[in-house]
């Protein structure tokens, strides 16, 4: 097994050991752009990184020079790596751009389980560019878009275009809540459409956006009349979450559900203009009938 050590200008990043002389020498020989801030990933044998109680190995330049002979050979253009002879063994050295990191490190930094990160890589849904170098998967953050993945989206929806004022009120309320919770909002999605219609293009695009980690909405019926728990479970399995601001309004509105269903059915039978009035009359008639039966 090998362990990956990352060297950046001025310091060596490793939780256990620092090898500035070794990594710096290798990076200087293998890459002419090391002075411009390039990184070098060096694969070392596991025994070289093991901790010893007496004197930790590979801590001083003298011990490094005594144990290791650095002779870069066999350049491999096009793959971004070269072979290095270290202590009689051939090891790979990978020179990467700034911002490159191991896929596991990227997953931990973005709050994603490593299993989900590998699954995204296999199905081609990883939201950042990645490349495989030997047995190592390196992730490159897009230039000019640092931290783009993992943003929060505010979702607001209305069933009728006559209530656009309420649509703006939803956006303002949810954004204020996110600001109070110190959650930066990276995207706002508004939509006008029936909660029973399952082919809402704007909402489906939001669900399929891998750069959105958290979706925040005022009430759960803004997502749809039914199926909230299913969508929440699917997003959770993908390392994402669905947040409802007004938890007090989570209780089912039976009258609202019936009105929505009747409106949808009346729109199919009689057209959209008369759908609302016919649905309201049907609900009122049902309420009167229920009152008479109670008497």
Curated annotation (Swiss-Prot):
Q: What species does this protein belong to?
A: Mycobacterium tuberculosis (strain ATCC 25618 / H37Rv)
Q: What's this protein's name?
A: Uncharacterized protein Rv2886c
Q: Which GO cellular component terms, listed alphabetically, does the Swiss-Prot or TrEMBL entry include?
A: cytosol; plasma membrane
Q: Taxonomically, which superkingdom?
A: Bacteria
Cited Pfam families:
Resolvase
- Enumerate the active-site residues: 159
Q: Which GO terms describe its molecular function?
A: DNA binding; DNA strand exchange activity
User: What residues does the Resolvase/invertase-type recombinase catalytic domain cover?
Assistant: 151-290
- InterPro entries given in the database record: Recombinase/Transposase-rel, Resolv_N, Resolvase-like_N_sf, Transpos_IS607
Q: What is the lineage of its organism?
A: Bacteria, Bacillati, Actinomycetota, Actinomycetes, Mycobacteriales
């Amino acid at each position: 097994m090998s362990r990956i050590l990352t060297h950046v200008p001025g310091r060596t990043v490793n939780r256990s050991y620092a090898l500035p002389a070794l990594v710096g020498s290798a990076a200087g020989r293998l890459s002419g752009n090391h002075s411009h801030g390039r990184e070098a990933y060096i694969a070392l044998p596991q025994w070289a990184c093991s901790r010893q109680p007496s004197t930790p190995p590979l801590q001083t330049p003298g011990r490094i020079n005594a144990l290791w002979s650095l002779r870069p050979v066999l350049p491999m253009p096009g793959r971004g790596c070269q072979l290095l002879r270290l202590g009689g063994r051939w090891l790979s050295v990978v020179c990467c751009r700034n911002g490159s990191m191991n896929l596991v490190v990227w997953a931990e930094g973005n709050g994603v389980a490593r299993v989900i990160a590998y699954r995204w890589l296999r199905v081609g849904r990883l939201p950042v560019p990645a490349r495989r170098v030997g047995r190592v998967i390196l992730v490159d953050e897009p230039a000019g878009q640092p931290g783009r993945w993992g943003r929060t989206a505010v979702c607001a929806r209305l069933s009728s275009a006559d209530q656009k004022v309420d649509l703006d009120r939803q956006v303002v309320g949810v954004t204020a809540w996110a600001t109070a919770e110190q959650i930066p909002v990276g995207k706002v999605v508004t939509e006008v459409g029936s909660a029973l219609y399952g082919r809402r293009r704007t909402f489906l695009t939001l669900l399929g956006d891998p750069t959105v980690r958290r979706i925040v909405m005022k009430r759960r019926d803004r997502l749809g009349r039914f199926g909230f728990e299913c969508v929440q479970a699917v997003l959770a399995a993908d390392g994402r979450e669905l947040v409802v601001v007004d938890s007090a309004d989570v209780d089912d509105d039976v009258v609202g559900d019936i009105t929505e269903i009747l409106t949808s059915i009346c729109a199919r039978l009689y057209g959209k203009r008369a759908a609302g009035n016919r649905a309201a009359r049907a609900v009122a008639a049902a309420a009167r009938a229920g009152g008479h039966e109670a008497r």
